[in-house]
């Protein structure tokens, strides 16, 4: 198994990831929750792309192993997004009010391209997507 793949076995799944420059690093322990693509206008504006690929993990299983991200209140009092203050990489999303799941951008995870547990199961907010998105594929 490569270093970048999820570590499994008798214990829980552990994945690591971080930003482009390496300043922000983290590990997440626990099962994948709701891997999906979001095509909402907020995700599109933040990323400069037509959608973002999200996956949830138990909040209790998150550990920042490098610098923590800078948080931006996307929807003040409701939702924040975490990014690297140096390279600008988008890392995470957090709902306020006792959230038990943290959203991690799948592309921030090491080895995301070969981790079958991260394959998106749905496309959220298609009504806000670029009109051509549903035609691609």
Task: Describe the predicted segments one by one.
Residues 2-137:
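A short Gly-Trp-Pro
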